Amino acid sequence: MFTGVRRFDPTQGGQASPVPFKKVKHEEEESKPETNADEHSEVEYEEESGDDSMDEAEEAKKPVEVKDEEESEDENLTADQKRKKKQEAANLAKRAEEKALERKRKREQHMGEEDSDSEDDLAPIKISGNNKIKLAKGTIRAKGFEELPQTEIYEDKPDESATISRKTQLQTQPILRNATYVEIDDVGSFDEFDLSKNMMKNLDTLGYTKAFSVQKAVIPWLLAQQKLLAPDRKPDLLVSASTGSGKTATYGIPIIEKLRDRIVPRIRAVVVLPTKPLVMQVRDVLENLSKGSSLSVVALRNDRSTKRERAVLETADIVVAAPGRLVEQVKENPELFSYIEFLVVDEADRLLGQDYYDWASVLQNNQQRAQAGKTNLTEHYVRNMQTLIFSATLTANPEHIASMDIHNPGVFVIGSSDSYSIPKSLTEIVTHVSAAEKPLMLCELLVQRDINRGVVFTKSSETAARVARMMEIMDADIFHKDWKIAAVSAETSSVHRRRSMKQFIDGKIDFLVCTDLVSRGIDFVVDNVINYDIPSGKREYVHRVGRTARAGREGNAYTFLTGSGEAKWFREIGEFVGRTQEVDATHINSSHNDGYQEALAKLEEEV
């Protein structure tokens, strides 16, 4: 059964010690006076050695004897050179003295703050009812457990610069300086946007009853830009919003509204996404939004011949594609991609990474070639392309967008001004487990928390396959829940992946055990995500947990931690995500160790 963790402390592997609470101070070595390389070549200063040493400021004035070689060199100097050298040494000594005094002042101030601790600060912490334990990096909630003494881990006071808000830090970056920050709760109605009757009908059919914050902020802005007179170049758009916040409709609605009255079919909008499953998902959404119009939405696919693909593209208005296939078609049929008015980059943090720079330059160079030589109004006019960039982690690496030739962008940060953003309705839970018992603890978690459906993330394809098989064996021999389980990774065939995904979405599979391949590629409704292995990157954590708590729904993200190293890494992740709630900590007990050992033996026989 579940029992409450006494205190989750990432630096100590989350372990709590039942001893009277007291502060433990980290000993720090005194650093030497800061000097540059030239200072070391001229004068050296003795370091204070303890309570009996001279005052630091006085000691800094005392130069060490200069070597004989230097004295012999001084004999060859002119009077002016000697005087100049002496003055430089005096200046160095003065600067070192000032630095020493400043360090001493800070140390005395810090010691004074420590001495001001009251007896109440040193009292044991007790957990009862719904008390919350405040940590430097977050809050852990425990419910209904016995009173336990706690051990606080002393942490140095953060630098004053660390207290500056993330919003203030972002505003120091030129491209984000004038960003508009929008609260996640700031929702509205689509009636406010002056949309066409056909679009309103489609939104009603899709069940879009309210406009989420990203839609309320961005859709009116985009619609207003379409009223600008050509040939003025329209401002580009940068949006930082969490996964599942409604980004597809945010750019889809204005694009379709702009293109719905077009006369001649041409590729006027291109949407680029990192994975094929995500391409198909977005294609479906845009098709539903464009119903009742003559617009054609096409997804580029590898299973179509080049000749057949060209025939489809000749009548397309909106193309949705992964970068690899898009580059092939642009190079093969450059004239078809010469009229682009909208370039949408979704999941931009991944698409604009180092491996993807080429696709952006291919598309932009093709657009520039199409405009080259158009010098007068009698020649065919080619519109400037407006770039719309969406990402859950845009503010983490804004330099990535430099390759996109961004023009006077409108910038919107939705829901959080932090570098990473996770859904507000997400509940995060951590539990410490031993590596040897992780498969057993996973099954116990599912049973004890009554989790009947979810996604389990692992670090590798091999781990995904082994965990899925262990779950099947333990379910058959121990838990008898009749789970339907599928493993999905880069090692599985595309046919198997598509079939497993469809079965999971249709409810025919209960648990999907997978690698990060799925964290960005599929949009499905799931209430529980389990990080069997903690991700190696902060942004991967964002995309994993973003599979749940989508579009305002509640969801849970469980993370297994093995050892203090992973616990420390989890805390570092927490420093960068837009966390709005405390992290829950829980512990799992099991009485099925014998059955678990038998299940391991069966797995080894199969392997």
Curated annotation (Swiss-Prot):
Localization terms from the record: Nucleus, Nucleolus
Motif (Q motif): 188-216
First-listed, main subcellular location of the protein, grouped into a coarse class: nucleus
Domain notes: The Q motif is unique to and characteristic of the DEAD box family of RNA helicases and controls ATP binding and hydrolysis.
Keywords: ATP-binding, Helicase, Hydrolase, Nucleotide-binding, Nucleus, Ribosome biogenesis, RNA-binding, rRNA processing
Single biological process term from Gene Ontology: rRNA processing
EC number: 3.6.4.13
Coiled-coil positions: none
Alphabetized Pfam families for the sequence: DEAD, Helicase_C
Keyword Cell membrane on entry: no
Subunit structure: Associated with pre-ribosomal particles.
Organism whose genome encodes this protein: Yarrowia lipolytica (strain CLIB 122 / E 150) (Yeast)
Keyword rRNA processing carried by entry: yes
Gene3D superfamilies: P-loop containing nucleotide triphosphate hydrolases
Molecular function terms, GO-annotated: ATP binding; ATP hydrolysis activity; RNA binding; RNA helicase activity
Family: Belongs to the DEAD box helicase family. DDX51/DBP6 subfamily.
Name of the molecule in the record: ATP-dependent RNA helicase DBP6
